[in-house]
Swiss-Prot record:
<protein>
    <recommendedName>
        <fullName>Bifunctional protein FolD</fullName>
        <ecNumber>1.5.1.5</ecNumber>
        <ecNumber>3.5.4.9</ecNumber>
    </recommendedName>
</protein>
<dbReference type="GO" id="GO:0006164">
    <property type="term" value="P:purine nucleotide biosynthetic process"/>
</dbReference>
<dbReference type="InterPro" id="IPR000672">
    <property type="entry name" value="THF_DH/CycHdrlase"/>
</dbReference>
<comment type="similarity">
    <text>Belongs to the tetrahydrofolate dehydrogenase/cyclohydrolase family.</text>
</comment>
<comment type="function">
    <text>Catalyzes the oxidation of 5,10-methylenetetrahydrofolate to 5,10-methenyltetrahydrofolate and then the hydrolysis of 5,10-methenyltetrahydrofolate to 10-formyltetrahydrofolate.</text>
</comment>
<dbReference type="Pfam" id="PF00763">
    <property type="entry name" value="THF_DHG_CYH"/>
</dbReference>
<dbReference type="GO" id="GO:0009086">
    <property type="term" value="P:methionine biosynthetic process"/>
</dbReference>
<dbReference type="GO" id="GO:0005829">
    <property type="term" value="C:cytosol"/>
</dbReference>
<keyword id="KW-0658">Purine biosynthesis</keyword>
<dbReference type="InterPro" id="IPR020630">
    <property type="entry name" value="THF_DH/CycHdrlase_cat_dom"/>
</dbReference>
<dbReference type="GO" id="GO:0004488">
    <property type="term" value="F:methylenetetrahydrofolate dehydrogenase (NADP+) activity"/>
</dbReference>
<keyword id="KW-0554">One-carbon metabolism</keyword>
<keyword id="KW-0521">NADP</keyword>
<comment type="pathway">
    <text>One-carbon metabolism; tetrahydrofolate interconversion.</text>
</comment>
<keyword id="KW-0378">Hydrolase</keyword>
<dbReference type="InterPro" id="IPR046346">
    <property type="entry name" value="Aminoacid_DH-like_N_sf"/>
</dbReference>
<keyword id="KW-0368">Histidine biosynthesis</keyword>
């Protein structure tokens, strides 16, 4: 068995075309979604990621802006800028690129975003809504993972899904989405005993810990579906996933590559949530 490659680039391309069509429809009502991104400091990876989001938004017809603040910017100034965006009726969605400099509290900043413009889905209100099955804005990587599984027609009902990692950004929210799809979900983490035994029982594995080579063919059962969220740069700057891709693809039924798997869907879901935010505030959701 050689695994079906779950091509995130192609899935994202098709999804973004549908978003572009919806943006065009919205423009007929006189509304254009706008994504505002706050970037504090000069972290190279963050700058690159923010530019990718801006470019992707503009490519589907949205307006996008980057508010680039100096590394030494105080927390008060960041919060003031957020308040301005919260009250700007032209802004549909707001996200703050992390990590933030040490003088700025990430939690304070995330809590200061208007939950109705929180397109990253990290505000406590939006996290809470996810956990009572009444979500509006869901964190983008978990949402992207579910789109990959849906696109591949993978039926999750009754399946054993194992999530490696318990972060609030990926592990915990994707576990909740898998539960909503009626999978039986196990979360593995750094204190889990006998991780291999859990992995061997898994029909679906989602790994999101940033440990290259963690998942090997020895701990994957034949026919499992593998979603690799890891993206750790090696000494040459090449991105490595958590999964030993070349060997695991020989026994899995489907697998995401790194890069080109989950990553393109994460940015796509930022756009999805920005469009949703604009529709909701204009009363245009069906």
């Amino acid at each position: 068995m050689v695994a079906k490659i779950l091509d995130g680039k192609q899935i994202a391309k098709e999804y973004r075309q549908r978003l572009k069509n919806q943006v065009n429809d919205l423009k007929e009502y006189g509304f254009t979604p706008k994504l505002s991104v706050i970037l504090v400091g000069n972290d190279g990876a963050s700058q690159s990621y923010v530019k990718s989001k801006k470019k992707a938004a503009e490519k589907i017809g949205m307006i996008s802006e980057i508010i680039h603040l100096d590394e030494s910017t105080s927390e008060e100034v960041v919060l003031s800028e957020l308040n301005r965006l919260n009250n700007d009726d032209t802004v549909s969605g707001i996200l703050v690129q992390v990590p933030l400099p040490k003088q700025v509290s990430e939690q304070k900043v995330l809590e200061a975003i208007n939950p109705e413009k929180d397109v990253d889905g990290f505000h406590p209100i939006n996290i809470g809504k996810l956990y009572i099955d009444e979500q509006t804005f869901v964190p983008c990587t978990p949402l992207g993972i579910m789109e990959i599984l849906k696109h591949a027609d993978i039926n999750l009902e009754g399946k054993n899904a194992v999530v490696i990692g318990r972060s609030h950004i990926v592990g915990q929210p994707v576990s909740k989405l898998l539960l909503q799809a009626n999978a039986t979900v196990t979360i593995l983490h750094s204190r889990t005993k006998n991780m291999n035994a859990h992995l061997k029982q898994a029909d679906v594995i989602v790994s999101a810990v940033g440990q290259p080579g963690l998942v090997t063919k020895e701990n994957v059962k034949k026919g499992a579906v593998i979603i690799d969220v890891g993206n750790t740069p090696d000494e040459n700057g090449k991105l490595k996933g958590d999964v030993a891709y070349d060997e695991v693809k020989e026994i899995a039924s489907a697998i995401t590559p790194v890069p080109g798997g989950v990553g393109p869907l994460t940015i796509t879901m930022v756009l999805n949530n920005t469009l949703l935010a604009e529709k909701l505030r204009r009363g245009l959701t069906k």
